[in-house]
């Protein structure tokens, strides 16, 4: 890609200027994903780089092996890593990305950190988990490691285990399944459908279930820009009984049923179920 090559040559010139002015600090550049073409171009046209930063999500654990296979010999780090991104997952028939459960996301955090710790070449400087807090991005629960109330999600437990080798004294609950009792992801507005979840807690703490229907987000931005939270429809959920509830499909459109499970000890977990009112 001639344009990309011109960019890397220009960045090389800038790096030389920076090093001439400040030789005591390394020069680092961050790219999105461990893309083979980008890495080869950097190796050929940007020799002054000292540290390569990579932002990666679903495939973050493969960044180190990819660099090694291409002959990369300089330090690198994961400048951002987290759960599979909303652009990396399957979608429903109406285009809604399928969000992994908080527990499935935690497994991705753990596997990524293990890959960094197992880096045989000794070139990995570490990584930054995204993100310590909560954020509306595609959904209110996709990327945050904490709930708005401060409760930790399973991803916090996962990074603690990877860093220390030990699980926290109190671990977050787990949602094993969430779905309509009779598969009805698409149904007429106004119809009522039963939903059931299966959840558990490692310490057998009593669990509290919170159900909420929200519209599918329409304010989708790029690059992490702030998004408006979609409208919620609390009246759409009736007859909640712990891990079970009934949902009245709202007026025509795309929605999600969110489930938050709390253990009363500062831990929580989340999952959601997309559905479409016809």
Language model feature labels by segment:
Residues 253-257:
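Exposed beta-strand face motif in extracellular beta-rich ectodomains
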Residues 274-278:
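Short beta-strand edge segments in extracellular beta-sheet folds
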Residues 267-273:
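Extracellular and select intracellular beta-sandwich modules with Ser/Thr-enriched
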Residues 1-55, 60-61, 66-73:
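Active-site neighborhood of glycoside hydrolase catalytic domains
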Residues 247-251:
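Residue-level recognition of secondary-structure-to-loop junctions
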Residues 215-246:
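Surface-exposed, flexible coil segments in extracellular/virion-facing regions
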Residues 68-223, 271:
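Substrate-binding clefts and catalytic carboxylate motifs of secreted carbohydrate-active enzymes
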